[in-house]
């Protein structure tokens, strides 16, 4: 007859596969559930169940990789523990999972797997707790002295511990109240054992075998406590703890973490990790304030249960602090001659940037503790601002890290999040230092002019401390909450324009202008760098393709219109792809022709195109011979691959009537030529302006018409009715083509005056002249910016003469020598000089003297 201690479990049980810990009957374990099958079990069985039976599950140890997503069911341990699900707690951080608290009931053996999806269900056979021994005499006859010996060792172990500790008092009550046949399972769950040893206890179905396996574990624990008491400081006896001696490790041990409710063990691996982490922090040579913070956090970590969310946050913080390069640096390569050669090999032109880097190296040789400069490269896209930053790091022998700031609108991206927030992390500056592993890298702050602003703060304001040499030696990230020295970091910022950079941030940086390339510079860059790069990317060799300079120049002038070389690089890539197709087809035809045999009595004929010449990219028939190597890229090949030219020289065709002039404009993409068109009609003296003009440009137009009206008699300018009042019964319409593009600035003033003078005089402006400059009401020409980009735009358009303000004469030194030799520059200080240079034969003043009236 069964006693009250017997348990009856269902014949079919859903299986919970555990990768952490082994549950024994009579013990409690807390386990994390995150695999798909276990998640389905919790959601569909435990959370939706309404009866006690639905909370009974089978807990089976699974030694396979928990991260594997294999669809087939892994080989399971054949013996498991029937358990009662006591508590289910769900969480979404750091990923969706459940924490399950289960209590072991009895052992069972899997006889058959009934189904595997959505969670495994098995038919089981109960192995113990079927019927208890009816009396102590029967129990003693069954096991003899074995149970008494086990009980004696268990009592000895408990007596060696401090009874004031609640866990020890609870263990003592269990020894007095629990049946002896349950003690091996309970004690094994409490003392320190490996998963392999717990599996041996689980597999011990008979009581005799279970006692035999458990007794050596108790003896090992007792001997360890005796040894510890001998070596322990007597003064520390008042602070007794439950001490567990680590068993000898074996290579085949299964790594696990025990979450038993009564378990007082700390995980071996976590303990080792904390010790290693503490050593790393002490050896990191961090400053004293940071070290004090880390020591304090380690003490908190040791006292903190692993189940607390703050445990992982604190550990991540300490790991970051130990990995930061507080004192690790790289030695600068200070060979100026080698640096000059390396910079010249990597980048063509850019003389100003190279000069600044060499100056830094020279000063660095004379002064070792020089702070890193804060440089800002400003120029149009595609001119190599980002790549030259990488070359500077290579030249100095430093680590390089790029931080993309385009679109960043949260100041926490720079300064980090405070650790009180969920998902907090350090800012990009500290994270970049962790990645490179040294405290003197080259940091490239890319697209600093495209920073945003939102309710989360202004990242540009957060950069003020980072980019200030007087403050960044004490940069404080919100996540670290301790100061970090950034004074050895070489910061390089890139931008397309300084107009959108806050003045306070711009003042902290040394701005270096990176102008666009001339046609000759693009040609040189293409044949030095771009063509070889594209050939390597497409698996081609110079023996297979030839791109002469004439073809490259045609791509530059007729297929691209840019200050940099990105579009040119893409066009060269398109050519290489087309050639790769021809080369691959030719190899296929050669391979195919080797296997073709002519029929008997006939000769194999090969069709050779008449007038065959050196191969180009033009399409040939499928049965034509493979193209001859190398494939030459000429004008016809460019048209076949890239299509008709996208840009044509249209300057001369648009200056065929009065009232049209060419101005020069600067954009973030480089310089551009800008047409100004004017027309007049009968009206009421109104001036109409179109072409998406800004306020400054509108004021320049009104200024130009006012100056011409005041000087109309001087230049013999009249309206349609012959009046010197140019707006008398006359309306004027000024238009700036490319109406979808916003235009503003004062530099179009001279072009507007010239356009209106051409309109009212009926004379054509010279078709090869472009001009730029601000005007005043007195007829003076004031200097403007962007001279180099504007002159390069005029040179690209095929113009021959450029009218510039006289006070911009010093800017001509920045223009390449070959461009200066191709152009004629007219430096004008007044509008009189501008008009004389813009028209063939000059723009003469009134020469007829006034009639003298006699006063006699």
Swiss-Prot record:
GO terms for cellular component: peroxisomal matrix. Coiled coil: none annotated. GO terms for molecular function: ATP binding; ATP hydrolysis activity; ATP-dependent peptidase activity; serine-type endopeptidase activity. It is found in: Peroxisome matrix. Residues 655-841 form the Lon proteolytic domain. A motif (Microbody targeting signal) lies at residues 854-856. Its main location: other. Residues 586-614 are annotated as: Disordered. One of its GO terms (biological process) is protein targeting to peroxisome. SMART domains: AAA, LON. Keywords: ATP-binding, Hydrolase, Nucleotide-binding, Peroxisome, Protease, Serine protease. Its EC number is 3.4.21.53. Residues 586-608 have a biased composition (Basic and acidic residues). ATP binds at residues 379-386. InterPro entries: AAA+_ATPase, ATPase_AAA_core, Lon_bac/euk-typ, Lon_lid, Lon_proteolytic, Lon_Prtase, Lon_prtase_N, Lon_prtase_N_sf. Signal peptide: none annotated. Residues 13-222 form the Lon N-terminal domain. The active site is at 747, 790. It holds the Pfam family LON_substr_bdg. It catalyses: Hydrolysis of proteins in presence of ATP. ATP-dependent serine protease that mediates the selective degradation of misfolded and unassembled polypeptides in the peroxisomal matrix. Necessary for type 2 peroxisome targeting signal (PTS2)-containing protein processing and facilitates peroxisome matrix protein import. Belongs to the peptidase S16 family. NCBIfam families: lon. This is Lon protease homolog 2, peroxisomal. It comes from Xenopus laevis (African clawed frog).
